[in-house]
């Protein structure tokens, strides 16, 4: 059985993702020209977007990676506590940080992470997400760069998973409810 059989419908095609990443890369390149840009990928979900975005950015930049988890709630909710599982390797002092995310959902994790990163004395901290789900927002946080707004459905592909599967789908699709019910 193919992974595609578990998908109810495709929300964002592979072609649309490629075009949007190129557009975001061009915008980021213009906005950060002459600055000390660091792309910070929040793993694991943003790995596919990060790989594509960094190649679409036409100016010199550094990359770094973090693994964070929200905990204290059930597996579908969060209490807003953020634990850093893997911290950045580099120093952020004087750098312009762009957090690269797969999806901005409730915003709770990023609303805690952004102030933590700002304590490291960067010039700036901004957010770039390929998917935004504003209907689920619980924290007062918005992306500075956004790919696509998506409805409140269970989306997978292009780095997003269910039970560590589907990340390698080249598009963003809605998972059939019977798969995760």
Give the location of each predicted region.
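PRPP-associated nucleotide enzymes
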Residues: 1-181
């Amino acid at each position: 059985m193919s992974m595609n059989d578990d998908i109810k419908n495709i929300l964002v095609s592979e072609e649309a993702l490629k075009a949007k990443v190129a557009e975001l890369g061009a915008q980021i390149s213009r906005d950060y020209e002459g600055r000390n840009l660091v792309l910070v990928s929040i793993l694991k979900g943003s790995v596919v977007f990060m790989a594509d975005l960094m190649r679409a950015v036409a100016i010199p930049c550094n990359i770094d990676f973090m693994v964070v988890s929200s905990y204290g709630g059930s597996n579908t909710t969060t209490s807003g506590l953020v634990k850093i599982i893997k911290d950045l390797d580099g120093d952020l002092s004087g750098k312009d940080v762009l957090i690269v995310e797969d999806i901005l959902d409730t915003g709770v994790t990023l609303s805690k992470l952004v102030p933590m990163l700002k304590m490291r004395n960067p010039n700036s901290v901004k957010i770039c997400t390929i998917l935004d789900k504003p209907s689920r927002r619980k924290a007062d946080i918005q992306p500075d760069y956004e790919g696509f707004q998506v409805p409140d459905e269970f989306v997978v592909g292009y780095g997003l998973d269910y039970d560590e599967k589907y990340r390698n789908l080249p598009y963003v699709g809605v998972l059939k409810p019977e798969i995760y019910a």
